[in-house]
Amino acid sequence: MIERIWTGHRSVVIGVSGIALVAIAAAGLLVVVQPGGTGQAGATPSATPGATESAITSPLLPNLLTPVPSPSETPAASATPGPDWVYSDLDGALAPPDLAHRLPMAIMVDDNAAARPQSGFSSASIVYQAPAAGGEDRYVMVFQEGTATDIGPVRSARPYFVYWAAEYKALYGHFGGDVKALQQVIPANLNNIYNMDDLKGGSCPYHRISTRAMPHNAYTNSAALITCVKKMGYPATYQNLPVRAFKDDAPLSQRPATQSIWVPYRTGLISYIFDQATDSYLRLVGGHYQTDPANGQQVKARNVIVLFQSVTTDSVTEPGHNRPVVANVGTGKAIVFLEGQAIVGTWKKASNTALTRLYDSSGAEIPLVRGEIFIQSVPIGTAVTYKAG
């Protein structure tokens, strides 16, 4: 059997004991498929439900296919929709009208080892993870219809996270930030975000806990944020937010048994396992199922999106800090995982405040499944691995 590794520019013929490895290095994509699957030049990996693949031992995939114990927590059942419920702007889920159009709140959250486990994941509509300073990553959790009793630890702003918050005209909650974010980006985008910086007089929603050391102990919650929105005169709701295309769940019979995804970061491996019954992906951090300490729920996503984006270093704005800068305005490669399938396509963000849109290989916008959206921004060249069940 002949196998090929695709680098995005050329193919190399190799032999790996009957297992075909398909790689697109330029897009940062590595897919493991059975012989007889997609392997022709220019083709994209198969997304056929029910496709099977083998666990293998390979230098390219060290320990990535080891089974993980089942989670101790199961996803909580959704509330029964009322007759007046409508679709939420951010994730397309059904919610009461006052929540479905509530002012989005984008909160910067720490990913230092001392900050884990973080709170708020299970209540967020959209979660972004991207490289930040010091070789660490950082999150911005965007809330709309969900209510969180704890969110945090809250950390500082970065310009590219501001651009993501600006997509939703969101309140942007953070503890300070780098010079470019505070002096250049945020003032220029005040028409598209509402700034709530603890270090600049906006401290009403934040508190520190005694069980963690600074700077990993600042928290907020939905109730405190809503109180501050009223106090600062910000609008409680929006009616005309830009929205993505959404679709309803596929029938159970059309969903594959499972799918596994691995997204490596410098701070650890993020992985997802598709759950056929709930049509969602259970999230793991460092090989362990992630539970939200705010409510004990297993963290899950209905959609997992990987954005391959250029990461450079800014050594000019703040000499000596050498902060990473993620180029999230423009266009690039993307993989959209939903309902146990993988769609290889393109992301496009036309401006600092424009919504990031996702397109398939034919140029059509990709409709997402209604519910939580987790967006993993990784440097171009990152090997993102996935396996069908």
What is the meaning of each model-derived region?
Residues V22, G36-G39, N191-N192:
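A general structural signal for well-ordered secondary-structure junctions
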Residues I5-I19:
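N-terminal Sec-pathway targeting helices
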Residues V16-G28:
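Hydrophobic membrane-insertion alpha-helices, especially the h-region
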